Each structure stands twice: as structure tokens, then as C-alpha cells.
């Protein structure tokens, strides 16, 4: 499990990560991962280097899914060539036995 967690965290650290809100930002910062919020992205405040991978990391609930869909649609229409990834965030949640981004730090920080 540790190796898979390390791999996922490495991927996230080397990409652009979008989360739902400020609490998620705080959790990811404690893990050394820089993020942008859903709100910032939807206001057009995200700059993505060409060819970068954008990880969409939302809670595993209806609202998180709706926000992930909105961000995916917005970024697909407004950015140049980039790769959107929603699966890595879900893998992280599953690996940490979490349903929200706020919950992932507990198993990782142990």
C-alpha cells in the first residue's frame, strides 16, 4: 500500500491538481502538493503548461462528481493541449479508504 501511495503522491506533485475547496487545499499542502480550487478554475484563474496533466481530485459523492464534471468540461473547452485525469484521485481515495479529500491525510500521515 505504501508504494502505491508514494506513486500516486509523486504523480500529483508533478501535475496540476484541482480540488473542491480550501479545506482540501490545506490537506494537500500538508502532503506537499500544490492545488487550485474548483472555484478558481471556474473563474478562469488556472494556468496550465502545455501538455501538463491536470488531476481532478474531488470527494466521492454526488456533489464532488458534479464539480469534477464541470471542471472537466470547462478545462476541455478553455485550455490548450493538456491531459485531464479523474482516476488518480479516485484511486487515492480508495487506497486511503476515504470518501473525501479531507480524509486522505490520516492514513498517509501515520
Predicted feature residues:
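TOPRIM fold recognition
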Residues: 13, 27-31, 36, 40-110
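Helix N-cap/beta->alpha junction signal
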Residues: 21-22, 60
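Phosphate-handling DNA/RNA-contact segment within nucleic-acid enzymes
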Residues: 1-16, 22-26
